[in-house]
Every structure is written in C-alpha cells, then in structure tokens.
Amino acid sequence: MKPFRLYWSNLERYEECPQKFLWYRGWGLLDLGGGQGRRKPLDTSSRRSEHHALMGILIAEAVENIYNKEWWRQPKDLLARLNDFLDKEFSYRLQKTYIKWEESPSKSELLATCKSSTLGYLKIMKHNRLLGDLYSRSEVTLKVELDGVRMGGRPDIVINRSDTGLLIIDGKNSLSPGKYTNKDQLRWYALLYYIAHKKMSSLAFAYFRYPPENPPKSHLNKKKPSEWTGLIPVSVSEKDLLALLDRAKQAYTKILAEDFEATPSSSSCRFCDYQRDCSAFRDLQIEKADLSQSGKGFIDLSFS
C-alpha cells in the first residue's frame, strides 16, 4: 500500500462519517467485497447517475486547455477550438460514464451546457483579467508534508499576478451559487500553498453558468447587490489555516489507526450511495421514527 495522502475530499468525507470514507475509498488489506484495498461495491440500483460529474470533467478539461496548452494566445479561434474539443471529448467520455437517462438531461442538453458553461468561464476570465503575468495554470498538483501528515490537492485554477497577487479559484457548474459548496475546500488549497510557498492566497469560486452579464437571482434579490463578476470571494486567514491543519492532523491520525466507525446523521447520510447497506443508517431511521411516534421529535426522511 502506498503511503496515504490526505486530500480535501478524504477529509470532508471522513469528518462526515469514517465508515463512509472507508466504503467510498477502500483501505489497506481490508476487503469490503471487491478485493483488498478496494472500495465497497455498489449494485446498479444504488448507483447515482454521473451526468453532473461528466459535465464537470469536460468543463474542467476545456479550462485546462485554455491555460495549460495556452489556447488563450489565439483568441480568434478559441471558442471554435473549444467547441470542437468538447464535441469529440463528450462522445468519448459518454461511453464510459454511467448515466440514468430518466434522471438526466438529454445528450444534446448535456453537451450544450458544457459549451455554454465553458463560454461562461471565458467571459468571467476576461472580465476579471484571470491571466497572470507570473503564473496561470489549471489543475495544479500540490503535495506537501508537515509534522508527518501527507496532504495533497488539485486546485482548478491558480493565477499569480504582480499587481494583485495569488488567486486560487474553484470552478462550479452549479445552478445555485453557494449551494452544496464548502468554503473550506478553497481554504484547504490555500493551506497547501502556504505550506509549500509560505504565501497567503486570495480565494474565489467561479460560477460557470453565471458570467458577469447573467447574475443569478439570489444575487439580484439582495437589498444592495454589488457588481456581479462571476466570482464569489472566500475569506481566509492564518487562523483559518491553523484550524484546518489541526483538523487534518486529527483525521490523518485516526485514518492510519483504522478508526472507521460509522457516525450517521441526516447531513452525512443524505447523499450517501450506501444507505441500503448501512446498518447505522437503518438504526438512525428507526430512532427517528420512534421519536416521531412518541411525540418527542419528528421524522425527516427527505434524504432517503
């Protein structure tokens, strides 16, 4: 087994429920039904449609080409080049992606969203001058080690400008800005960058579907809406980074000790693919039902 490295997705999942982390990832010599070290197998009925993941991967690859292959240097042909790339890559990846079409938009709608969201990022990029004279890269690999804790991450976009400094961006294709996002994801990248380079970062989420000329309703409904740029800044301080590092150390130590006890809750179980296999989840349901029947609480099965 390769030495374990803690990524944000690992930390978030472990803090939600250690058993959830284990079943999604696998560990060491443990056999969860799919072989030693492999994740717990899922039957088709429990498996979630991957159409959202498909769009996210394609948009991320398009943005990666803009920066890492420097397609931005040929602006006249850029959009046509991106659309051609998305046409080909969509056909290729679609064959390898599990999609429940009764839950997903059509193929043409999925591809159209990939193209419009990529165009949305181009507009956000232009409006916010997201090219750095010092550094502009996408899908940047960060690997660090501190006090015996191995950590890693891959920020979507890293921009370093001599006038505005370092900016780390996480791209989102969400219909609802701010929903199902965790600001600590960006702070995690800031922590890694600080450990590696001793430099603080500015942080922001970029919402591909909402370029500057198309602000979301949630922004327009504010009492005094500011200018919409397509970016939502995330605050970060050295105190935030120290707190996150402490969480990482605690989780890392427990994972290496193979502490994988289930900690079910409405929030951690809501989007878990393993509800049917989890006795802790069933016990939680029974407990809620008992509370409801006794008049001491209420049952909320909206996540089941």
What function would you assign to each model-found segment?
Residues 4, 8-9, 45-53, 104, ...:
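Short, charged/polar micro-motifs that form catalytic or ligand-binding hotspots
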Residues 8-71, 83, 87, 139, ...:
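Nuclease catalytic cores
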Residues 136-191, 196, 250:
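Non-catalytic protein-protein interaction segments used by genome-maintenance enzymes to assemble
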Residues 51, 55, 110, 114, ...:
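Hydrophobic (often cysteine-bearing) scaffold residues that line and stabilize catalytic clefts
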Residues 27, 171-175, 207-209:
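A short beta-strand motif that forms part of the nucleic acid-binding face
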